[in-house]
């Protein structure tokens, strides 16, 4: 159902794993 977390938190609105196809959603990074 829900997208998986890519990282525990976002850093200044960006994901640590952003280049792996993740997006910052609220305070979590979610898989696109």
Curated annotation (Swiss-Prot):
Key words, A-Z: Disulfide bond, Knottin, Plant defense
The keyword Disulfide bond is assigned to this record: yes
Pfam families: Cyclotide
UniProt GO BP: defense response
Entry coiled-coil feature ranges: none
UniProt modification remark: This is a cyclic peptide.
Crosslink position(s): Cyclopeptide (Gly-Asn): 1-32
Keyword Disulfide bond attached: yes
Disulfide bonds: 6-22, 10-24, 15-29
Physiological role: Probably participates in a plant defense mechanism.
Membership in a protein family: Belongs to the cyclotide family. Moebius subfamily.
Protein name: Cyclotide Hyfl-C
